[in-house]
Amino acid sequence: MDVNEFDFNLPESLIAQTPLQDRTASRLLTLNKHTGEIKHTNFKSIIDYLNTGDTLVLNDTKVMPARLFGVKEDTGAKIEMLMLTEHDNGWEVLIKPAKRVTIGTRISFGEGKIVAICVEELDQGGRIMQLNYEGILQERLDELGLMPLPPYIKETLEDQSRYQTVYARATGSAAAPTAGLHFTESLLEDIKAKGINIAYITLHVGLGTFRPVSVDDVESHKMHSEYYEMSEETAKLLNDTRDSGNRIITVGTTSTRTLETIADDSGHFTAQSGWTDIFIYPGYSFKAVDAMITNFHLPKSTLVMLVSSLATKEFIMNAYNEAVNEKYRFFSFGDAMFIY
């Protein structure tokens, strides 16, 4: 399967640079994968598409303010570091400019409040860094770090909390699970009041989010591993939903990938944690997910491929072209799509 089959023309003016004042004010494109019907509405109306007994699955990961600007201790050269994932031997990071950082390089942030030492070189600007810091790392990041906004967002984010979901709890992501940005606490309460269950999983969004597909053949692409967790409570709720014949609806590609990683062939779950590099593209047979809320993604990205596998590639690409014609807002701060 050729990567170019997932390409589409996107005017730069449709890439949302700032979040809307009201999280629920986004537009919503609904796609009925059974009838082929497409409708245009607003995100507040998502509740009308959810049925009593359905379970909505949210990713409660929290974005770290993990973008740091420092200097090399020996030369004073400026370095940008994006922290991604904690490993046994240090933190996996992205470095700019990577050529300045080799094994043994020391980088100082905040006049030594954090010192990072390179212990391993990875490809594409990746490094493993050991961190030395005063006190608690999260406090130092809150003091020195910035939100790691995607490269297509050029404007400064005035309110850092707008790149977090209102239910973010488990710190560890390098990017927000953006489909969840549309929800407010009030909307979630209204959803629960209708008899719809809310379940939480955790998947820490990592390096794969920042890596484009660099191969021509879709099947040759290798996903980066990301850490996930599912609790006993969530596993039971999802199993009860499955056994009662109700729908499991994921909010975002991260929740989708987590559920499809954990589900057995019967679509049931067990509590667990681990690392997933699952790559979902057309031809994949879903075990667990019946419907999904998601944003509009980058051309030729693994996320467009995942979305195309829940419906059909032709249906999704037609919907994307319609969204462009209707001037929907794209990417992290953009509008949403519901595939059911």
From Swiss-Prot:
Pathway: tRNA modification; tRNA-queuosine biosynthesis. It is found in: Cytoplasm. It catalyses: 7-aminomethyl-7-carbaguanosine(34) in tRNA + S-adenosyl-L-methionine = epoxyqueuosine(34) in tRNA + adenine + L-methionine + 2 H(+). One of its GO terms (molecular function) is S-adenosylmethionine:tRNA ribosyltransferase-isomerase activity. Its main location: cytoplasm. InterPro entries: QueA, QueA_dom1, QueA_dom2, QueA_sf. GO terms for cellular component: cytoplasm. Its EC number is 2.4.99.17. It is an enzyme of class 2 (transferase). The keyword Disulfide bond does not apply. NCBIfam families: PRK00147.1, queA. Belongs to the QueA family. Monomer. This is S-adenosylmethionine:tRNA ribosyltransferase-isomerase. It comes from Macrococcus caseolyticus (strain JCSC5402) (Macrococcoides caseolyticum). The gene is queA.
